[in-house]
Amino acid sequence: MKIYKKNHFLKILIIFIYLSCNILKVNADGTFSTIQPSTDIKFDKSNLEFVAEWDVSANSISNVVGSTDSSEFSLNYGVWGPTYNYLIAKNKSPSIKANVDYTFSFDFKLGKALGEYNNYQSMVLSFYIPEDIAYFPWEIRTPLYTTNEFSGNFASTSYQSKILTFRSTVDIGNSIMVLRINRATETGPTASSVYFRNMKITIPSKPITTPTDLLTKDSELIVIPKPPISLDLQDLTKCPYLTASDLYNWHDPTIWPNGVVPSPNQNITIPAGKRVLISASSISQTQIYSRIVVPVNSELIFNDQNFTMNIRDIYVQGKFIMGTSLCRYNSFINIIFHGEKTLQDTIAQFYGSKGIAVASGGFISVQGKQYHNTWSKLASNVWSGDRVIWIQDNVNWEVGQQVLITTSVYKDELDNQNEILTIKAIEGKKIEFTEPIKWFKYGSQEYQSEVALLSRRIVFSSDESSSVSTSFGGHILSSGEMQFAGVQLKRMGQKNVKARYPLHYHLGGTLNNSFISDCSVTNSYYRCYTIHGTNNVTLTRNVAYDAFGHCYYLEDGVEVDNRISFNLGAYVHTIGKPAAGASQIGETFYQSSELTQPADSAASCFYITNSWNSFIGNAASGGWAGFAFPNLPKPIGNHRTLNIIPMQYPIKEWQGNTAHSSGYYFEDGASIYVGGNLTFNEANGMLIYNSGRLGRTTYVNGVKNENNVVFDRLNNTKIFLSNLGVGYWGENIEIVGYESHDNTRPVSLFGNVWLHNALVNGQSGNILTKNSETTRQGFRFYDFYVQTIISNTIFRNFIHSTAATKRDEDNVVITATTFSDVFKPQFISATKNITFQNVPQSQIIGHEDVANSGSSRLFNFLDGDGSVTSSFTGKPGIPQIVGSHVSWWKFDDSCLFSTEWNVWVCNKGTKGLANIEFWVPGFMERELEQDPDSYIGSISLFGSGINDERKTLLTRNPGITGVSNMGWYAYFTIGTPNYLRIWTAQIAFGEYIFLAIPYPTGTTFTITSEYDYSNQYTYTITKTTSALAVKQGNGKQYYFDGTHLFLKLVNFMNTGGSWESFDRVGIKIPDVYWTYIYNIRATNTAKPSVNGYFLNLPDVRPSSTL
């Protein structure tokens, strides 16, 4: 029987109904409460621990045998136990709001009559920093809050109630409840017990009122884009179940072979060339359908009706339609996938089992009711016990749907404070839940927890019986065009089975009309949304929560030109042991049956193997990282023979993405992590992943060409509650528009770096981040071979921590990597237009004097406009050179020494910063790492009126950085080498170093300069008549006065071109030039060198008048 078009009136009626259902609601669904009821936080044997100095056993706290009251428990004391013990909660306490009356209550009774050794006098209720609990009972630290010692009727053998009201004067976020129980004496010669029941903290009820401080924007500095406000346009006259005269009902026997409707246990093939409609009455809603094939030129269309379909496999070569872009279905449709774990292909060859596979040339469209926005952010703080929240965007969510509120703590996986709640009532931006919120959630101007809708009317899920124990759910795979919108995918994916993901574009090539929009993936066994070997698709406005392995997943490194926008990923778990490591090396993982993709040891919300894609308005909560950009020197998987280098592609577009609560497993972990290395071992066919440092250089079109180097650029980015906000091991990065809040450090950046228009906030108002011994730094300058410019940046709320034992480990704005004598800084760091808010002067710079460390002695940066140092110098607008604690940096009388910062600060004037290296073949070379205490002399300033000693030490590890256009006097305690090479690593065009080195009287010299890679710049340095002539010359002359050899070091390769420096906002950092060398060969027949060194030379600086 054919299904013909309905009449025009019916079409208009359907359109009206649809629009009425989908309009963004302004009227309430359900009834809002006016009073928030009280909330009880209950304690019993399961969530309390017995702690004492001695007499502790597994039986010290136990359930009461025979009791029907689950709250009842006993404390069981042995003989001669201590006079007090503690009950410590195993879980964190609710947040406690200042100046609010809470109650702590319980019932108590003695196990035997009151006596000399059975006398309980008092108790004390306290709340401690969670980390301090580890010190109990031997070291009791100061609590966040404690009550006075309280008594009660603790002398009865029948239950007596005790209610204690307590009020804190400060807000308390993370804490652990501790109850101290005090006895009059030790426990005595016989065992005894006491009993508790109904122990609880009660959060009081309160009127529900609209907060006066609702946010009107989500960020202070940056702009985070949002999706369009309007709903997608609908035309229900185009619904697939209405519009065609050639549409046949599934239950019509005339279309099937032999005139019989197939049974569920058959392999069912849709008749060739037919368009078949499934309605609720067409199929069994309880039996499991085995396999359905939709051949080429056939279509399987679902009606917009409430129903459930149980299925094992569906293979689509033609079309599978359950709603379209113009006709999104309003009905509640459940597709449940069944099947035991197997690696066999039961859908079709290469397509696995338990799911839907769409062949190349096939088409699938599943589009349910549009809920918009799919996620928002809190508009105000939420406290434990609250049931009503306000969000920042209007939504059309519905009563009974499930909502996620993401965590507001740092270590998401280790302290899960994400919450799923059910809507009781909703109106505009106001939502009431059926149950109280357990944990404090932050929603102030700095940042806000995300609030996401998990429920959808169309649900694809896996049956629990065959899925949960094996992590083997259903999967959707399409090699053709695929459109999914308004669908929830629950318990989907097949853990560690490649290509078996909840929703997956698979080897589709370049598609033209494919998208996944406003869907949700929840409780996924393996990933969330995958783009594999497919280009030009859109993932937008989706939500993902609670998934194993990388979530939004670009698989092989060849996926480009995709648009990934306005998506949320949250609570993403590594597979197996998380990648850790206490150094930049990270950890290495190998492909195995338990870790099919070894990079899942560092599972992230967004995993990006090729950067040439657009990322707009996405948010990541949790994961090993929020956004991971692993380095792939070659594609992997199906594309490993393709001749491209994925890691060389720059980011196509990055605008307004945020991340939080990640980066804590690895010392160098970050919420945005550009690092790690994923390779394919050709010998054994296995993948290898290393989580540590590997650099990348990006080029136009991903093709290596030194003339087409292109910067990665992150625009309008926000990171909070992270270890490192952005960790970038690459060579060229610009971060423009950036907010960092409550991160250990905002960034760790390598190569050419520009951080511009940033807000770095060391401490937000989030009470969950306070009372921590973790300190935070504003920016750590690296130690060598980078170029870093920070401009237009606000640093806020860096306050001294009493727990900090070193300057550079305190809550301080500027620090540097200063541990090494091998890796020493050149002129690599500069600042301009820096602002400090609530930062005491002592916390602006934290330089540490590290023993035997050249990087500590040579710490330096250019304060390009004096804005960093003006609070100390009183010289705003005047550029300053900042150098370490050694007198080497005191180059003129403008220099001031800050004891708070442990640095010298000097007017830059006409000076610059330069770096050279002394090389003695076989003794002191760049590639020969030596002990840090291998001291061989010193280098001092001379001339320019300097009469005192201003020097630093030299070691066998080459490298010295100092002020250019000055006299440098090098003295070698081991003796001056008769052959010395000097690498002019960083001497900018127009600058010089006036170098003096002692030699014995009568020494003659052969001096040349050369470029390692060309003889075009080879010069013979000739003798002139005076040291002054050398200083005023062009760098091609030397002079020896019988005591000192004078040379003017310049780099003849430099011409002043723009390519010779890293230049942003008027600040220039010269490049390190590889490798322009001066060669000095010295001969003396009267006082010859001994083993290559002229010994016992006097240490006398040249004249101060030079």
Swiss-Prot record:
**What residues are glycosylation sites in this protein?**
267, 306, 512, 536, 677, 715, 833
The UniProt disruption phenotype note reads: Shows no aggregation.
Which cellular component appears as one GO term in the record?
Answer: extracellular region
Matching entries from SMART domains are given as: G8
Q: GO biological process: what's one of them? A: aggregation involved in sorocarp development
- Domain G8: from-to ranges: 254-380
Q: What is the annotated signal peptide range for this record?
A: 1-28
Q: Where in the cell is it found?
A: Secreted
Pfam families (alphabetical) = CEMIP_beta-hel (PF24606), G8 (PF10162)
Q: Which UniProt keywords apply?
A: Glycoprotein, Secreted, Signal
Q: Which family does it belong to?
A: Belongs to the comF family.
Q: Which PANTHER family match?
A: COMMUNICATION MUTANT PROTEIN F-RELATED (PTHR47687:SF6), G8 DOMAIN-CONTAINING PROTEIN DDB_G0288475-RELATED (PTHR47687)
Give the protein's recorded name: Communication mutant protein F
* Species per Swiss-Prot/TrEMBL record: Dictyostelium discoideum (Social amoeba)
Q: Which gene encodes it?
A: comF-1
